[in-house]
Amino acid sequence: NKPAFTTFYKLYSINNYSHPKSLFFRAMCEYLHKKVDGTPDPLITKDGLTKIVKSATLFMFKFQSIKGGDSKDAIRYFEKVGKQFYGKNNLDPDWISSIFADALLKEGVDESMIRSSFINMDFYSKHDLAYCVLSLLESIDVKKNEDGSTSTRLLYSQASAMLSHIKDKTFHIDHMLPQTPD
């Protein structure tokens, strides 16, 4: 579960989203909660923390980075989450995840919109987004099942490792894009 958490947290950090900060802070505080005597007493599980980070980051990544949605439109969903849990003991990762999934549908963000955005997007002007997308695509593992169908999964460790190098100039977009000889 740690690679999944770090993958989505890196996506959040690379894209410099501001709206999830308070939600992530609260979720991490609940995960790191201790009893009065100092012994660990997490209010949410590691899986719950990962689910919150994943759902909020994917919402921002799909809505703001890919669709180009306005930050002012995104904040209302984070406000809804904040109001729901203000003064309460712990967050509900399933409820939070469903809020962001519903928000994407409400904002018209679906698979066809994402494909259309990718076709028309100038990734050279959006270096960090291009690097994130290519890192995720490169980390997809496709397996053929016995019944002839295929299944896909994201290799979180690989994605996390690739995303770690976005700021250190180890790779350039030109290294990741297919090259056509002249």
What are the residue ranges of the model-derived segments?
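A cross-family structural signal marking well-folded subdomains
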Residues: N1-E146
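Generic recognition of flexible, low-complexity loop/linker segments
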Residues: T7-I14, Q158-L163, K167
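Short helix/strand-bridging catalytic loops that position acidic/His residues to coordinate divalent metals
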Residues: G38-T45, A159-M162, D182
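Short, contiguous, well-ordered secondary-structure segments
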Residues: S135-L163
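Histidine-centered nuclease catalytic patch
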Residues: S164-D182
